[in-house]
């Protein structure tokens, strides 16, 4: 049986699934180690500057394609950071994301991943993931989110910013999958709970990997 099935597989709304304890401790450690190693290299973790000149509160690593925080578009090089090519998306990470999509009833072959490293004071305001291609958005290709490290208070709303939101706790090893009719729902992170992650991961804070199909 795939991880995430059975009692730990919760449908939040049609098209959105919380797969609790989806990743094994060994998988969490392997993902954290790989992301930290990639993030320490050239074209590694950076602090994006958004429109208006304000830095985001997370550090970001883009794999497969780079997300430009000033233009809200994807590109092959980090033109808003250092001009370096975006690192490739490791096949083993892509396979894990495809497996999670299957566990939630979707099919996905991701070609990019955004890794956000949350510190104790990091937040992410309500937003839609809508910068992928028109074809991808129209098809409802899901976003696959993995949480590694400290727990996060997560909001999942509707198709309008002012719609009611559901409040969830995402813990280390959880996957959250949203696609189909829920693909463009607003979501965000209001709080990180320091010290709640597994002690053996080798870092502080929370790594959030979101896999997409451009």
Question: What kind of region is each of these model predictions?
Answer:
Residues 1-214:
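Non-heme Fe(II) oxygenase metal-center motifs and adjacent flexible, charged/small-residue loops
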């Amino acid at each position: 049986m795939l991880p995430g099935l059975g009692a730990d597989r919760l449908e939040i709304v049609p098209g959105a699934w919380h797969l609790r304890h989806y990743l094994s401790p060994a998988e969490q450690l392997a993902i954290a180690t790989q992301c930290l190693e990639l993030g320490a290299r050239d074209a590694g973790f950076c602090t994006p500057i958004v429109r208006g000149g304000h830095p985001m509160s997370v550090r970001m690593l883009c794999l497969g394609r780079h997300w430009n925080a000033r233009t809200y578009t994807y590109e092959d090089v980090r033109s808003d950071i250092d001009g370096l090519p975006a690192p490739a998306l490791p096949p083993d990470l892509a396979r894990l994301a495809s497996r999670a999509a299957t566990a939630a009833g979707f099919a996905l072959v991701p070609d990019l991943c955004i890794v956000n490293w949350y510190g104790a004071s990091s937040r992410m305001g309500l937003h839609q993931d809508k910068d992928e291609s028109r074809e991808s958005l129209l098809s409802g290709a899901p976003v696959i989110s993995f949480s590694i490290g400290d727990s996060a208070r997560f909001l999942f709303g509707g198709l309008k910013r002012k719609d009611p939101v559901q409040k969830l706790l995402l813990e280390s090893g959880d996957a959250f999958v949203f696609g189909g009719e829920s693909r463009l729902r607003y979501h965000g992170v209001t709080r990180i709970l320091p010290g709640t992650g597994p002690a053996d991961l080798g870092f502080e804070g929370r790594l959030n990997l979101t896999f997409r199909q451009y």
